[in-house]
């Protein structure tokens, strides 16, 4: 065998021979097998080192520990603030939409009522059955609203109002009677037609009662002539 000048040339020759035999036998060269096994071992060792590095926990500082403890609370407060603001905004939007809907509804009713009112003033016979029903319903609703506002819900106030009403009626009733009595009790003026008629009636009653003997004249005894009565005067009157 030929001598090799160096180990490198010897190794190169061995590789060449191995490749030739590998081509003939269709096998992998020894160098490649050794290299693959070495590569596998290196990769396995590297993977193991990486796993060890990952599995070993790194020590945390006090600031990191405190931040980890406070992190859930901070997230919860942020979430609550967001939800609170969003709920407030939603409520405001809902109120605005509801108000706008009510205003639109009132405006539509006003337009409808104005059209029907105009039709009633110009041509009432042109009103349809639905419009007549609408007017009846509107009138009934307004009457109920007035009755509701005029009614007193408080029982004490209603009772007090009824008592005041009764007192006023009692005060008014005697005044009317006293006025009539005063009118009847006031004597008529002298010289008036009423006074003359009253005097004639009184004189007639007096004479009638005197003739029947129900009353007596002043200075007379029942059944006797007056004290100053003179028979001669009566005879003279008869002779005349």
From Swiss-Prot:
Q: Which domain of life is it from?
A: Eukaryota
Compositional bias, Acidic residues, is annotated for 228-240
Query: Which compartment or compartments is the protein found in?
Result: Nucleus, Nucleolus
Kindly give the Pfam families that the UniProt entry links to this protein: RRT14 (PF17075)
User: Which keywords, in A-to-Z order, does the entry hold?
Assistant: Nucleus, Transcription, Transcription regulation
Quick one: where's region Disordered? 28-67, 215-240
Q: Which GO terms describe its cellular component?
A: nucleolus
State if Kinase is listed as a keyword.
no
- Compositional bias, Low complexity, is annotated for 32-46, 58-67
UniProt record similarity statement: Belongs to the RRT14 family.
Q: What does this protein do?
A: Involved in ribosome biogenesis, probably through modulation of rDNA transcription.
Protein's name in the database: Regulator of rDNA transcription 14
| Originating species | Lodderomyces elongisporus (strain ATCC 11503 / CBS 2605 / JCM 1781 / NBRC 1676 / NRRL YB-4239) (Yeast)
In the UniProt record, what gene is named as encoding this protein?
Answer: RRT14
């Amino acid at each position: 065998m030929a001598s090799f000048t160096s180990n490198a040339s010897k190794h190169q020759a061995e590789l060449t021979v191995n490749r030739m035999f590998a081509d003939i036998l269709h096998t992998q060269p020894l160098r490649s097998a050794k290299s693959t096994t070495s590569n596998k071992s290196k990769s396995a060792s590297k993977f193991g080192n990486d796993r060890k590095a990952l599995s070993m926990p790194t020590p945390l500082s006090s600031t990191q520990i405190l931040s980890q403890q406070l992190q859930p609370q901070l997230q919860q407060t942020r979430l609550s603030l967001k939800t609170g603001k969003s709920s407030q905004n939603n409520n405001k939007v809902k109120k605005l939409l509801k108000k706008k809907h009510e205003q639109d509804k009132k405006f539509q009713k006003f337009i409808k009522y104005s059209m029907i009112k105009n039709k009633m003033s110009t041509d009432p016979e042109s009103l349809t059955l639905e419009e007549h029903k609408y007017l009846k319903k509107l009138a009934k609703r307004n009457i109920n609203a007035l009755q509701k506002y005029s009614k007193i819900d408080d029982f004490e106030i209603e009772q007090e109002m009824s008592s005041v009403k009764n007192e006023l009626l009692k005060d008014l009733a005697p005044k009317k009677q006293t006025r009539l009595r005063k009118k009847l009790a006031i004597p008529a003026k002298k010289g008036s037609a009423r006074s003359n008629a009253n005097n004639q009636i009184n004189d007639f009653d007096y004479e009638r009662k005197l003739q029947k003997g129900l009353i007596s004249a002043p200075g007379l005894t029942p059944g006797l002539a007056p004290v100053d009565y003179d028979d001669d005067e009566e005879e003279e009157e008869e002779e005349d």
